[in-house]
Regions:
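Helix-loop segments that flank and shape redox-cofactor active sites
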Residues: 7-20, 34-55, 103
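Short, charged/polar, low-complexity loop and linker segments
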Residues: 9-14, 99-100, 163-168
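Extended amphipathic alpha-helical scaffold segments
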Residues: 3-4, 34-39, 67, 156-163
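Active-site-proximal alpha-helical scaffolds that flank and shape metal-associated catalytic sites
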Residues: 50-155, 178, 182, 200, ...
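Alpha-helical bundle segments that constitute or directly flank the non-heme di-iron/ferroxidase center
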Residues: 2, 16-44, 111-123, 188
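A non-catalytic, amphipathic alpha-helix used as a structural packing/dimerization or gating element
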Residues: 24-32, 56, 60, 175-186
Length: 209
């Protein structure tokens, strides 16, 4: 529940997310996007049809998600120098290190990880559709559109089918699922020491404005 109802997500969905926070998030998530996990997943896929499905989705990400990042980083005047100089947040580093640690793990563990990640994105994007809300900020609407719709629902459905086929609640992949939920939650919001949630990107804002 917390992973899809963070402050960041809620404010993105209702168009109250500060531009400086979104700008910092785009930098962090694009760095995260380039972690190579899809390539590892395709390599381990047990059937050719599964490899083909994953490869097609990887190309879709390149054509749509990467294009989204590039467009809005440019729209928010993020230079290549600024992008390269921005260090990952602690939560991003932790998440990336965990995904790197999965590189030599089994197919069930990897497919569970990607399924959990994508399912969470669909779940929070679906919140805005269920509420019949359309974002007016182009970057907000674009991000929701990428993660809600017939194509993305089918993608997540295919992943769930693969998890049901290859994974077990008694296997190590169960811990992978729990860990991904925890890391996704940390990626979007970190609790403040004395009260309300704060964004994990807040420490970067002074460098981005």
């Amino acid at each position: 529940y917390d992973a899809i109802n963070s402050r960041f997500v809620s404010e993105l969905l209702d168009d109250t997310l500060p531009e400086s926070i979104l700008k910092a998030y785009l930098i962090q998530d694009f760095k995260f996007y380039n972690n190579g996990m899809m390539a590892r997943l395709i390599k381990l896929a047990p059937r050719q049809e599964t490899k083909d499905m994953l490869a097609a989705q990887s190309q879709w990400f390149a054509d749509n998600e990467a294009t989204y990042f590039e467009h809005f980083l440019e729209a928010y005047h993020v230079s290549q120098e600024e992008y390269d100089a921005t260090e990952p947040t602690p939560a991003n580093k932790e998440y990336g290190a965990y995904l790197d640690s999965l590189s030599d793990k089994s197919w069930p563990e990897l497919i569970t990880a990607i399924c959990c990640m994508e399912w969470l994105y669909l779940a929070w994007a679906k919140r805005t559709v269920d509420a019949d809300v359309i974002q007016q900020v182009p970057a907000h609407k674009g991000w929701v559109d990428l993660h809600e719709g017939a194509h993305f629902r089918k993608w997540v459905g295919d992943l769930i089918s693969l998890v049901n086929e290859y994974c077990s609640i008694d296997g190590p992949e169960a811990e992978v699922f729990r860990t991904i939920v925890h890391l996704e939650r940390r990626f979007f919001d970190l609790p403040g020491e004395d009260g309300p949630e704060t964004y994990p990107y807040s420490t970067l804002i002074s460098d981005l404005t």
